[in-house]
Amino acid sequence: MKDNTKEKLKQWLGENNQIGMDIWEKKYRYNNESFDEWVDRVSGGDAKLRQLISERKFLFGGRALANRGTNKKGSMFNCYSSGYVPDNIEGIMQLNTNLALTYKAQGGQGVSLSKIRPKGTPIGNEFKSDGIVPFMEIFNTTTSSISQGGARKGALMISLDIMHKEAETFITIKSNEDRITKANLSLEINDEFMDAVQKYYDWGETVVIHESREYNGHPIEYDVVPIKLYKLMVETVYDWGEPGCIFTNRFRNYNLMEFDDDYQIETCNPLTDKNMRI
């Protein structure tokens, strides 16, 4: 590294932080710039912001650190969400295109399959749906194929309402190591589901919830046994590390925009700590 960049970087990151230095060099340094030049670029010439970064009191996300003040066409944001995947082939393919374009710009994406009709549900008058899995595989392939501006592969979060008829398939799909390999999975869990689970552990009561849903004029009915799905989820997470949990009542009712009637959180992006609205 030129001038005293190595020493300044070491002071900024802390001693014996070779991993941090390597990451800075490979991911965030632009055109062999010095550490001071990097801070100037990232702060955009703002003296107060420069001081905050230098003192490690503030830092942008990775895409801003890599792309701000450069000629790159990459995004300034790490992650986005496209919300619910539409329950029609045109909308699904358009969303898949949006995923690819987001990855190209170095962003990640989050999508929810909760509005997709389950396997066996009629399509028109002649055919039946193959359900959520084929579209998970399409999105998985796109994520694997599109590099984020040549810097890294795409990042994808796929979520599903735990009351969806295919929740069991979603929970266990990663137990096959060759299927969905390029996406994180999470279940959207509401209070009704968790209350039913709690009744089992408090009173030994097995609650059965009857679900009635309609997909483009085709009604379906089925029963959900929360404790059965809960136990399957816990076992699968123990063995495979996924799926995660998105507690929908919490993030929809406890956020800075909860009193804005026009604001509705639909799902998360791969960062998981940032919930997104469409």
Short names for language-model regions:
Residues M1-I278:
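Extended catalytic cores of very large enzyme megasubunits
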